[in-house]
């Protein structure tokens, strides 16, 4: 029995909690950089599930890896080992030039994991008094929507009316090295065990920090004996033209937090990747996940890692990203107030229309994007997009901008 668009929308409205306000597109199938709705209309996906689809929809290599594993075993709890787990951990550690991996499922779980690990490291390695550890975060951050994470968010939608809030965090302005230094040099500085930072703030509108900021954070963390934890859940795995966005400043953090693209757009796969000194503080029973590191997730993630090995996706992101950012930067300044991004990742802030209206207009033109923070839209095309497809999408964006 077929169900038409209005019926599907009615079912969503009636039975789904209203924690999302989706654009009026109901996807039925997808391949590569394109999705098709229930009425057979095609759209160029220039959002790629916030970087979860770096390799596009249903990439043949990832589908093949999934099918191979589906035919063998999909889940065993961490009470037992399996033949995909060790190789996955070794290969991801090697890709990140780190020692150890702690796999989870969602990005928020990886962030929560890092908070627990940083605190325990602070107590057992640094000697910070128990229950006194602090973690420095940044204004405009987005690290997830769990209770602890929203406690240090300054986004009213994410934060307000979800208290009481988890203590133990200090927030400073993003990109402000002086503020970071002042915290370390102030009365609470000796309690700061980690700095949690997005190399580029995605949810905030793809905000790129000032040149030298990440290197400065790295230097201050080293000087003050604190961990630098890089949340690369959106920015990592090729999105910015590098395997990791931190590499743009030759910065190596103490830990990477990875997710989204690590699951190939098929499974939720996330991980904290760090040194033995850091992850080695955990003992059996102190952290875990029934599904984290399951055979199917590991098999898919191993194929993702293999696809990133030769750097071709990273180079493609850098090259096509230059084209995209150049075209977007040429949009009329009377219409667009700011364009920012790196690689195939951009935020475009409009003067004359809310971001939602722009995204609805783009959807009518066959392009999928998503608004954030009022008048900004986010663009994150899959890294497999062709030059012709990118040109087609950018032409539609230019057309919509011209009509505003």
Residue ranges and their predicted role:
Residues 1-404:
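Conserved N-terminal phosphate-binding loop of PLP-dependent enzymes in the Aspartate aminotransferase
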